[in-house]
Amino acid sequence: MLQPKKTKYRKAFKGRIKGDAKGGTTLNFGSYGLKALEPERVTARQIEAARRAITRHIKRQGRLWIRVFPDVPVSKKPAEVRQGKGKGSVEYWAARVKPGRILFELDGVPGPLAASAFERAAMKLPVKTKVVARFGDTSHLGGN
């Protein structure tokens, strides 16, 4: 699973995800993409599950790009432990995703296959998403 090799600080504040994504909102690599429509933290496990769903559905043809990286450590205290005594240990890593952010990109596969692969991936993610195409019109993809 994805996680940083090295970080400046071991633990992070929870924070809030405000506003729309400034960067990473256009397709830069592939012809088709999966775009987030709402703010949410996406865990490394969810990204990996979505990646597996896509690669299995397209039967390893074409090329897949993951456009988000889980760089936020999420800490958790163990079960049945009293409050206080410091912050809990890091439980998992997550990516803060803002609306408009491209999560995955695909190239080298037909449009309808890309759309169905992204729909399967969307089921693994905690955000509402939509399929976008480099050349605008997504009516030929079906589903949307």
Curated annotation (Swiss-Prot):
Domain of life: Bacteria
Record key words, sorted: Ribonucleoprotein, Ribosomal protein, RNA-binding, rRNA-binding, tRNA-binding
Assembly information from the UniProt record: Part of the 50S ribosomal subunit.
Listed GO biological process terms: translation
Lineage of producing organism: Bacteria, Pseudomonadati, Pseudomonadota, Alphaproteobacteria, Sphingomonadales
Classification via PROSITE patterns: RIBOSOMAL_L16_1
GO molecular function terms listed in the Swiss-Prot or TrEMBL record: rRNA binding; structural constituent of ribosome; tRNA binding
SUPFAM superfamilies attached to this UniProt entry: Ribosomal protein L16p/L10e
Protein name in UniProt: Large ribosomal subunit protein uL16
InterPro entries: Ribosomal_uL16 (IPR047873), Ribosomal_uL16_bact-type (IPR000114), Ribosomal_uL16_CS (IPR020798), Ribosomal_uL16_dom (IPR016180), Ribosomal_uL16_sf (IPR036920)
Species per Swiss-Prot/TrEMBL record: Erythrobacter litoralis (strain HTCC2594)
Family the entry assigns: Belongs to the universal ribosomal protein uL16 family.
Pfam families documented for this protein: Ribosomal_L16
